[in-house]
From Swiss-Prot:
<dbReference type="GO" id="GO:0070929">
    <property type="term" value="P:trans-translation"/>
</dbReference>
<keyword id="KW-0694">RNA-binding</keyword>
<dbReference type="Pfam" id="PF01668">
    <property type="entry name" value="SmpB"/>
</dbReference>
<dbReference type="GO" id="GO:0005829">
    <property type="term" value="C:cytosol"/>
</dbReference>
<comment type="similarity">
    <text>Belongs to the SmpB family.</text>
</comment>
<dbReference type="InterPro" id="IPR020081">
    <property type="entry name" value="SsrA-bd_prot_CS"/>
</dbReference>
<feature type="region of interest" description="Disordered">
    <location>
        <begin position="131"/>
        <end position="157"/>
    </location>
</feature>
<comment type="function">
    <text>Required for rescue of stalled ribosomes mediated by trans-translation. Binds to transfer-messenger RNA (tmRNA), required for stable association of tmRNA with ribosomes. tmRNA and SmpB together mimic tRNA shape, replacing the anticodon stem-loop with SmpB. tmRNA is encoded by the ssrA gene; the 2 termini fold to resemble tRNA(Ala) and it encodes a 'tag peptide', a short internal open reading frame. During trans-translation Ala-aminoacylated tmRNA acts like a tRNA, entering the A-site of stalled ribosomes, displacing the stalled mRNA.</text>
</comment>
<dbReference type="GO" id="GO:0003723">
    <property type="term" value="F:RNA binding"/>
</dbReference>
<protein>
    <recommendedName>
        <fullName>SsrA-binding protein</fullName>
    </recommendedName>
</protein>
<dbReference type="InterPro" id="IPR000037">
    <property type="entry name" value="SsrA-bd_prot"/>
</dbReference>
<dbReference type="InterPro" id="IPR023620">
    <property type="entry name" value="SmpB"/>
</dbReference>
<keyword id="KW-0963">Cytoplasm</keyword>
<feature type="compositionally biased region" description="Basic and acidic residues">
    <location>
        <begin position="132"/>
        <end position="157"/>
    </location>
</feature>
Amino acid sequence: MAPKPDPGRRVVADNRSARYHYAIEDTLEAGIALTGTEVKSLRGGKATIGESYAGPSGNDLMLFNAYIPEYLEANRFNHDTKRPRRLLLHRRQINKLIGATQRQGYTVIPLKIYFNDKGRAKVELGLGKGKQLHDKRESVKQRDWDRDKARLMRDKG
């Protein structure tokens, strides 16, 4: 049975392939600077972050390649669907993430976009390194073995 989500946390977009392609070592929550039509479009539950990433742009951390569709009820005041969006973090967190990406070969990947209990749009970021092909195969084998083990224990018990 799947775990029940937090009552105040409504997930809008989920990057399920991120944990397959990257070995995530650390996660943190960041705010995201959005326009009004982007927020309304997110509340409709439509966003894609499968191919997006976060990276430095000057002194800030930006979310690149995240797709938030146009809000249909807005006419000429709509937003660009794949524009870079500023991530709202403390300076110490920004410096840590930029340092890890530049010096140690890490990548900052968005894992989820959700609304918290106060109705603010947040992004869950993961700091990780890319997996090689043999690491991905090993992850699949381990996941299959865990499923078989759980199935055997459930059938015996």
